Amino acid sequence: MTSGSLVRAGTGFATLRGMLDIEFAKRAAEAAIDDASAALRELSLDIHSHPELNFEEEHAHEVLTRFLEQAGFEVERSAYELPTAFRATFGSGSPALAVFCEYDALPGIGHACGHNLIAASGVAVGLGLKAALGPGNGAVFVLGSPAEEGGGGKILMIERGALNDVDAAMMLHPSPVDGAWPNMIAIEMLKVEYFGRNAHAAAFPWEGVNALDALVLAYSSISAMRQQMRPTDRVHGVITSGGVKPNIIPDYAAAEYYVRSSTASELAELHAKVAGCFEGAATATGCRLELTSLGRPYREVVTNDVIAEAYCENMGRFEVRLPGRGQQGGAIGGASTDMGDVSQVVPSIHPVFGIPTDAANHTPGFTAAAATPEAHARMIRAAKALACTAIDLYAKPELLASAKREFAAPER
């Protein structure tokens, strides 16, 4: 990292609570991010080339915390009793804003959700705010959250106090398109197991209780049920165990299912229907069913309109016009994230920034795209816009108050 961002530390907000030139502060943040761009690119590629699954992100944790510490942040490693979480702090008092980093990868396809870019973007926003935030003007927390891909790292962090002193939270996520209101829905992850009885499939099939039959019947029942599901509901699964040899009736079969819906309350309704399919198949075949949860359910993302509109305005600084609320078009739809749980606790936004690719998230093509110079440039642009949005919240008490009123409204 160059020294430019460190030299500027605290200059932008010298008179924040007075009549600050907010434009000067934003330019200071943008300059700091630009100064660090080459180092952030190295950081992103380092994480990209060392993909680690959820709760195993030891390398990412090390390089991120070292980078932030060298940049002058006060860093707590292995924060919140999670070995690969961290909290990096600059400043103190109120307002206190949090920006999240994610850095876990996917099995077999590496950083196919671009978490290397998310990690670098969180650091970039932190550097920008450090360059503009002077003494007594509030705090910025860069929070390293492990295990977004199914482990619910942010949920554990929330339960252990990560947001107790936070006024608002934000993060960025790569996507094939740009958007400030991505449709990120609630999810639960289930393990389905059927237990039957072995028998010779040719000589004595009548002595068997076929666990695979139960699983196939449940799979077919769920497929038939889709005709009556809401357009926003999603149920998808894979068979992880279906027997060992064709001439042995399987006494065990298993699958993993993801069940999603627009809200946590609608998810509860859908769960009951899906569970009915699993239970009915057990009854029909005489098998025993075990249905268990794979980690914590994620709640839906509730985008704070006040902050999202400020982000859209700040993206305009770079001649990017984002679609308004309800006009997302091709932005991420139907995916899920534990940032949804954050958005249920404090006013939050989770914008997506488009990187040049025809590939969707969670595909090998997106893995490759997440390492390109073009993707890095888009990340830098979005990080500057997010830092400027945070500056608006620091510098305009009425804006943060409006975001909090929206968050507290019962109809949100």
Sequence positions of predicted segments:
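Acidic/His- and Gly-rich active-site-bordering loop/insert found
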Residues: 20-140
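Generic non-transmembrane alpha-helical segments
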Residues: 28, 32-36, 42-46, 50, ...
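Alpha-helical metal-binding/catalytic segments enriched in His/Glu/Asp
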Residues: 111-151, 188-194, 201-225, 255-259, ...
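Acidic/histidine-rich catalytic neighborhood of metal-dependent amide-processing enzymes
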Residues: 123-185, 401
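Midchain, well-structured core segments that form catalytic/ion-binding scaffolds
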Residues: 158, 165-316, 330-340
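Zn-dependent metallopeptidase/amidohydrolase metal-coordination segment
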Residues: 324-385, 389, 393, 401-412
